[in-house]
């Protein structure tokens, strides 16, 4: 059952419970070993890397752990929009590991006292994958969409998720607004008012705001909309499933960096902190990093990045969230009450 198919009246915690999947990977993780040891690890993740975890990463870790310790590992997996997943964990969903879209969502869990160690202390400051924000278009690009400004043309139908539930949606807004501030659109460089105007023009064309990036791209694959603002890897995964998917890389776009963290309070309660730590460490290994690239995600490991460089198009002006002052500043300017996003939406709602 996908999140989109659930009743909207369900709370994030109820959603997580409904979406828990027993992830057995290669099928060997369900029975006891010769010494009878079977352990369980619960992963709470955002929607985008579902295939990467379920089909590649988790089975590989199960084999790794079995060879190292003789123990079988059974995974329970929950996939929601990043913000919804973070709120579910804070609200009582006992994930041992959180793999989310943005560090602000991990920080929300830390502020609730559930993460007690410095989750950024590991390799790559706690980041496990990268991507970029791109524009998915119809085969042959019949609408002639080439950059951010094109998404604001009257008459277009655009898809992007809801920023209240989706980390991907927040990345999308940061990409468009940041590109405008940097002179990567028709807006004059450094002109915040013009950047806000462009964001409004694009949001005016948004037809559907789904709960997560995965639901958004699935609707696009079903024929809804002319374009979708999305993670690059979502389009690449769609191609793997047989979709005739194309995308445009804006000349200026943001580098997406996705964090992972052990939820200390839950792992301690479940007696599996060693297992959770080992899984997070495994995600940084060359084996796992290569597996992520097989599902369209860009690696954080520089050696692996060099190996797969030809798979991913270059970006003329690639910036990071740090260029917007970091997540606390981006949230204050863009997503806090009275911020850019709220002002734009209020203005659009006030239009006849």
Residue ranges and their predicted role:
Residues 127-132, 196-203, 210, 241-273, ...:
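Periplasmic-binding protein-like
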Residues 44-47, 137-138, 157-191, 202-206, ...:
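Short beta-strand->loop
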Residues 267-352:
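Extracellular/periplasmic juxtamembrane helices and adjacent flexible linkers that interface
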Residues 183-250:
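Ligand-binding pocket segment of bilobal, Venus flytrap-like solute-binding proteins
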Residues 20-23:
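C-terminal motif of bacterial Sec signal peptides marking the signal peptidase cleavage site
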Residues 1-13:
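Bacterial N-terminal signal peptides that target proteins for export
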Residues 26-166, 349-350:
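N-terminal segment of the mature folded domain
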Residues 45, 49-57, 85, 94, ...:
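Stable alpha-helical elements in mature extracytoplasmic
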């Amino acid at each position: 059952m996908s999140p989109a198919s659930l009743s909207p009246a369900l709370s994030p915690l109820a959603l997580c419970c409904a979406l828990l999947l027993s992830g057995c990977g290669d099928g060997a993780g369900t029975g006891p070993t010769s010494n009878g040891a079977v352990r369980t690890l619960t992963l709470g993740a955002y929607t985008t890397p579902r295939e990467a975890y379920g089909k590649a990463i988790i089975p590989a870790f199960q084999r790794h752990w079995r060879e190292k310790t003789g123990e079988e590992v059974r995974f329970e997996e929950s996939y929601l929009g990043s913000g919804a997943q973070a709120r579910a964990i804070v609200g009582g969903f006992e994930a041992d590991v959180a793999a989310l879209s943005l560090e602000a969502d991990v920080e929300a869990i830390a502020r609730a006292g559930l993460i007690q160690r410095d989750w950024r202390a590991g390799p790559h400051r706690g980041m496990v994958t990268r991507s970029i924000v791109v524009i998915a278009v119809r085969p042959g690009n019949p609408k002639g969409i080439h950059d951010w400004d094109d998404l604001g043309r009257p008459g277009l139908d655009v898809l992007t998720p809801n920023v209240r539930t989706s980390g991907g949606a927040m990345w999308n807004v940061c990409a468009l607004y940041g590109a405008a501030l940097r002179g990567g659109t028709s807006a004059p460089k450094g002109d915040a008012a013009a950047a806000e105007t462009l964001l409004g023009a694009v949001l005016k064309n948004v037809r559907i705001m789904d709960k997560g990036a995965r639901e958004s791209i699935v609707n696009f694959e079903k024929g809804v909309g002319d374009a979708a603002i999305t993670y690059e890897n979502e389009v690449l995964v769609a191609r793997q499933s047989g979709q005739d998917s194309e995308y445009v890389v804006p000349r200026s776009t943001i580098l997406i960096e996705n964090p992972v963290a052990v939820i200390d309070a839950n792992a301690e309660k479940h007696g599996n902190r060693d297992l959770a730590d080992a899984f997070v460490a495994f995600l940084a290994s060359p084996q796992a990093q290569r597996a992520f690239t097989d599902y369209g995600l860009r690696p954080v490991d520089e050696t692996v990045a060099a190996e797969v460089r030809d798979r991913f198009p270059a970006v003329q002006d690639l910036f990071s969230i740090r260029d917007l002052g970091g997540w606390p500043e981006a949230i204050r300017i863009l997503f806090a009450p009275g911020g850019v996003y709220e002002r734009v939406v209020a203005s659009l709602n006030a239009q006849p």
